[in-house]
Amino acid sequence: MNRIIRTLLIFFLFNISTFSQTYIGATGGLMSSSLSGDAPEDASYSGKTGFSGGLIADFTLTEDIVLSIQPRYLQKGTSVAYDVGEYELRDSLTATFDYVSLPVMVKITSLNKRIYFSSGLDFGYLMNSTVENIVDGSTKDVNELIKNYDISATFGFGVNIPIGSPIISLELRYMQSLLNLSDISTSESGSTFPFRFRTSGFQFLTSIIFPI
């Protein structure tokens, strides 16, 4: 996965001059994510808010089609609520997954490039994963239970706001893992994570890009 990410970055950095218009800038925002799939016994998953931030490079392919490369840091996670015999489930654990992420997106622009629809793949490499016990505040490393790579499908809608030469973009994006993230070879029965699960969630992103 690291080799794929490096190859894509090198390819686009050395081929910037072949595109009709190139923009570079910064992007950041929030992600509300959770796990989908099997849940531990007597438990359910709920959403957790994380952060993302990184760089963005937009390459204009045609008048209405833009290729966007966005290397970044991305934080995913979930809360795990257990049935403790009360009317409502009680949050007991919080899981956090820190990724180096490389979304490769295609944007289709409309209305004089003021709005766009985006779709693509997000290649992620897991840097760290932890579970925090909300009750006693203890934290446990769970890297051995999670695969160190992920590929997600992404779909989004955005608005471009020109402010002279720079452009500010606001985007709402949905992200869904395509792979089972559980490391079955080392998972243990009765652990926090089951044998099959994926991450999914919504991101709200703000970007500013400059023509070069």
Task: Show which residues each predicted segment covers.
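Bacterial Sec-dependent N-terminal signal peptides
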Residues: 1-27, 202, 206-212
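Short glycine/proline- and aromatic-enriched beta-strand/turn motifs that initiate or cap beta-hairpins
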Residues: 20-58, 67, 211
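Residues that define the transmembrane beta-barrel architecture of outer-membrane proteins
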Residues: 22, 47-51, 96-100, 147-153, ...
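Gram-negative (and chloroplast) outer-membrane scaffold detector with strong preference
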Residues: 22, 30, 58-132, 161-166, ...
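Flexible, solvent-exposed loop segments that connect beta-strands
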Residues: 35-45, 76-98, 127-149, 180-197
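A broad helix-preferring feature
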Residues: 52-56, 116, 152-154
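Predominantly the C-terminal beta-signal and adjacent terminal strand-loop region
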Residues: 79, 145-155, 159-212
